[in-house]
């Protein structure tokens, strides 16, 4: 009771002293909370409602009890407050950020007679990991924080500041953005502030509303909207639109652990496991201090390889693919080359890596059914399409068809990249379109503008990379098909890896069974896209095609690989690539 009264007392102070300063109090930052169900008559919620009626925005931490469902701070669920989840600096929702509850909502009436509807989900997400914040002079620091502080904070500031993580660190970021919005436009009321934050948000890859609300906060767009420079943001936000297709996935059975001994020569063991017909997606994950890749093989022999654990890519590797009933295998392989230079040109080893055990686990997502996808049953990409639809990486058409074999158009690719690749929505502040061949009234216009904007991926921390899609002689060409080479560019660019792609030199190869196989059609890949194709292959975003040839006197066949850079990507093919992209993107979550 004392804690509640103290909290309410702080909110009461803001109301009582709102006009006691040169500038009125317009926003409160609340890095505290509780647990349990939302109750509009709770004293804290009544207090924030009074602040709302006085024009004061209450910003609340969503809580640090994630990733489980229904762990959301009940004070953050009030529809008149802004609830803030936490992201990491590489733009993934952090595991500790509290989640809402899928589908939970309710209506209620406050004592003043006004009816409200609440949704058990965060409003927005902001950076909340490894943030430099004030500390008490007497509090002891964990050893890891003390070491991090010594490396990143000036000695004179060490007694007063430390690195901290939590939605408590994310909340002040949003409160500060709200303050800037109100400075730009003091006439905004709390409902308008919340609306702008949601309409200008960035969709987070593979995260739904109950987990991350509208997505990642976009301070630049929020200020542009608040100041009246634009008033039409929101066309790309997943939570603000209706989808033609829907699918529901749920966690599958218990994870299958594996511990595989890698040896550079000889047979490398594999672990087999069974997958049922209800499984929509299979993923194998390992964190290794070695140049190792994880390889999944489905019952038909189709392989799904992870990225290779390298400093430029990261130490956590994940391989994923659409579910298929039967016996699967998981194994590991070493790297066959670095930057195009073969490490084992004779193919006598399992790839280059130190011997040792690789520990990880295989996880599953089960199908819960889908709607608006009447033509995908039995298609080779059915499970991948279902997975992509469930995580808002793709959508079907209004006639309940998906058309998996139809070529994807550039306007659709722009839409799907914005839906599921953590790309900021950007619109020209001077009102002048970046191209003239797509009308500003088109539902695809905002997607296309954002796709060609520089610095749009949140992974591009310097915000200086080129757009995830390009223009052709100043035109967007929305109806053009998408080739595999151009898709490689878009996916790698969305990961913020422009510098690595541009710096690549050497032969184009694909990793297969511990070896690097040269691409027979490497000469067909434009020089500017070679590094993008190589990274897309190395990270398992796109696959190569293999074949065997054997001359009349050869003792054994020769394995060949090609990329088919000019081949047009189908909508089913995009769904597979989008699922792999999501798997790779979320590897960064600590």
List PLM regions with ranges.
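C-terminal subdomain of the subtilisin-like protease fold in secreted/lumenal serine endopeptidases
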Residues: 25-29, 157-161, 183-269
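Acidic, Ser/Thr/Pro-rich low-complexity intrinsically disordered segments
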Residues: 211-212, 224, 261-305
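Active-site alpha-helical elements of protease catalytic centers
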Residues: 1-8, 162-182
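Subtilisin-like serine protease catalytic core
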Residues: 1-5, 21-26, 52-55, 77-81, ...
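Extracellular S/T/G-rich loop segment that most often corresponds to the catalytic His/Ser-adjacent loop
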Residues: 76-175
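N-terminal propeptides
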Residues: 236, 361-590
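C-terminal edge strands of extracellular/lumenal beta-sandwich accessory domains
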Residues: 233, 240, 296-303, 320-374
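Subtilisin-like peptidase catalytic core
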Residues: 1-40, 85
């Amino acid at each position: 009771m004392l804690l509640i009264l103290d909290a309410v007392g702080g909110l009461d102070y803001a109301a009582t002293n709102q006009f006691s300063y040169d500038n009125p109090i317009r926003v409160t930052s609340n890095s505290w909370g509780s647990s349990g169900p939302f109750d509009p008559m709770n004293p804290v919620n009544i207090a924030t409602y009074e602040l709302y009626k006085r024009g004061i925005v209450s910003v609340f931490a969503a809580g640090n009890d994630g990733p489980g469902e229904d762990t959301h701070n009940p004070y953050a669920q009030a529809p008149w407050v802004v609830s803030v989840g936490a992201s990491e600096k590489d733009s993934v929702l952090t595991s500790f950020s509290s989640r809402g509850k899928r589908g939970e909502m309710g209506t209620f009436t406050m004592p003043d007679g006004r009816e409200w509807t609440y949704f058990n989900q965060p409003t927005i997400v902001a950076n909340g990991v490894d943030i430099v914040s004030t500390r008490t002079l007497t509090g002891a620091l964990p050893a890891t924080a003390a070491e991090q502080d010594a490396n990143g904070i000036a000695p004179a500031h060490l007694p007063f500041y430390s690195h901290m993580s939590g939605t408590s660190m994310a909340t002040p970021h949003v409160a500060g953005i709200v303050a800037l919005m109100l400075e730009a436009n003091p006439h905004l009321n709390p409902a308008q502030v919340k609306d702008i934050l949601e309409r200008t948000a960035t969709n987070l890859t593979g995260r739904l509303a109950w987990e991350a609300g509208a997505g990642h906060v976009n301070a630049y767009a929020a200020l542009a909207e608040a100041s009246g420079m634009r008033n039409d943001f929101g066309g790309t936000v997943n939570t603000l639109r209706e989808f033609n297709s829907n699918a529901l996935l749920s966690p599958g059975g218990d994870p299958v652990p594996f511990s595989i001994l890698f040896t550079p020569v000889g047979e490398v063991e594999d672990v087999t496991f069974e997958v049922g017909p209800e499984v929509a997606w299979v993923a194998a994950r390992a964190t290794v201090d070695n140049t190792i890749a994880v390889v999944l093989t489905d019952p038909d022999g189709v392989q799904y390889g992870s990225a290779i654990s390298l400093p430029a890519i990261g130490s956590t590797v994940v391989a994923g693919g659409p579910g298929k009933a039967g016996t699967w295998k998981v194994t590991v392989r070493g790297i066959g080359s670095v930057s195009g230079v073969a490490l084992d040109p004779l193919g006598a080893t399992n790839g280059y890596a130190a011997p040792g055990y690789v520990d990880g686990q295989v996880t599953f997502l089960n199908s819960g059914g889908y709607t608006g996808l009447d033509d995908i049953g039995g298609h080779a990409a059915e499970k991948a399409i279902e997975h992509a639809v469930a995580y808002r990486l793709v959508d079907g058409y209004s006639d309940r068809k998906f058309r998996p074999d139809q070529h994807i158009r550039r306007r659709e690719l722009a839409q799907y990249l914005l839906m599921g690749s953590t790309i900021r929505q950007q619109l020209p502040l001077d009102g002048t379109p970046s191209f003239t061949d797509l009308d500003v009234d088109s539902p695809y216009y905002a997607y296309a503008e954002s796709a060609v904007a520089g610095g749009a991926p949140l992974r591009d921390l310097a915000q200086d990379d080129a757009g995830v899609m390009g223009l052709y002689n100043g035109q967007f060409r929305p109806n053009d098909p998408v080739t595999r080479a151009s898709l490689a560019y878009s996916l790698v660019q969305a990961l913020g890896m422009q510098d690595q792609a541009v710096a690549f030199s050497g032969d184009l190869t694909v990793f297969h069974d511990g070896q690097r196989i040269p691409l027979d059609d490497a000469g067909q890949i434009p020089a500017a896209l070679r590094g993008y194709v190589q990274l897309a292959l190395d990270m398992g975003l796109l696959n190569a095609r293999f074949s065997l040839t054997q001359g009349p006197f050869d003792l054994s066949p020769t394995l060949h690989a090609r990329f088919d850079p000019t081949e047009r990507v189908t909508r089913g093919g995009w769904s597979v690539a989008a699922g792999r992209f999501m798997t790779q993107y979320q590897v960064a979550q600590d």
